[in-house]
A protein has these predicted regions:
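Generic structural signal for well-ordered alpha-helices
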Residues: 142-146, 178
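Conserved SGNH/GDSL esterase-like catalytic core that processes O-acyl groups on lipids
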Residues: 30, 41-140
């Protein structure tokens, strides 16, 4: 067997090679996704009165696409407008979303500060040994989510996704979120950063059209 296919090329970046088969994304049998509209497949449309309506279209979401490509079962717990606070304090419990999965992808942070005005805080708000003491900040609630998932499956692989840059004034905060999320990942076993801030295209007004 030629093991060179598993080796990184010189100066290779995470998104330089995107395989149509999704590569090793199919190594898991079941993945849970916790996110906002960017994970729920949310569509914007107009009703009969011309008012804008937002609808979660899970069958068009990227977890649904990955499920079709890889054969991995994706449980999508996302919803448009979701925040770490709402997911931890009400949404997951109300919908029975604290479920076992082999791996989890957490993609939150777009709404928490920029839309809802929740305080970001820092990883100093996270007590991995006693999460009930975490501060009610974005990072405090993110820490609670990771801790809760670890109680469900201690060996779960958890992938934390950072927000994309937007080419706007908030980019400074986005870079801060990414740097703190990297520290959060270091606090837990089998917890990894998917750094969209550093490697994904800028999610500016043109891209959002």
């Amino acid at each position: 067997m030629d093991n060179k296919c598993f080796e990184l090329g010189a100066n290779e970046q995470p998104l330089d090679i995107i395989k149509e088969t999704c590569g090793f994304a199919g190594i898991f049998k079941q993945i849970g996704v916790i996110g906002d509209s960017l994970a729920s497949g949310e569509f914007e449309s107009h009703d009969e009165n011309g008012s804008i309506v937002y609808t979660d279209m899970y069958e068009y979401s990227w977890p649904a696409v990955l499920e079709r490509i890889t054969g991995t079962k994706y449980n999508n717990y996302s919803r448009g407008g979701m925040t770490a606070r709402e997911y931890m304090q009400s949404w997951a419990d109300a919908n029975g979303f604290w479920q076992w999965n082999q791996a989890y992808i957490i993609a939150l942070g777009n709404n928490d500060s920029f839309v809802c005005g929740h305080p970001l805080g820092s990883v100093k708000d996270v007590n991995a040994e006693c999460p009930q003491d975490n501060a009610d900040t974005f990072f405090g609630n993110m820490g609670k989510i990771v801790c809760k998932l670890k109680t469900i499956e201690p060996n779960a692989r958890i992938f934390v996704v950072t927000p994309q840059l937007r080419g706007e004034a908030c980019d400074k905060d986005i870079r801060y979120i990414a740097s703190e999320l990297a520290k959060l990942c270091d606090m837990f076993d089998f917890t990894y950063l998917l750094d969209m801030t550093a490697h994904a295209p800028v999610y500016d007004a043109e891209m959002r059209k």
